[in-house]
Amino acid sequence: MLLASVILLLLDIPWLLLQGATFSKTVSDIQGSPLRVKWWAAIPVYLALGYLLVQQKSAVGAAASGACVYAVYDFTTLAMFDKYPLYVAVLDTLWGGVLFCLGFLALSACKVGLRL
């Protein structure tokens, strides 16, 4: 599970860097102050995501699970906050699917490599 969590974090970093300005502006619009990330809170998030990833049996299943997890967050946020853009919810949900699919493939490759 720890390996899966690390893989997901490493795969997520480029997305977070690419979308950082968008998310920062969105949060600032919603809360009226700049985004300040509590990095320690990412630990239980990635551990939970890693746990979910290791339960997957296929890349397609992983993609579906990732999209579902991200959709729960994004569309709940969309439902609660007027200033949360629909396009952010859709893009981030799609990213959740891509992230979990890539994570599943990377984790599978690591498992094969560890058996050699």
Residue ranges, per PLM feature:
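Juxtamembrane/disordered regions of integral membrane proteins
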Residues: 1-116
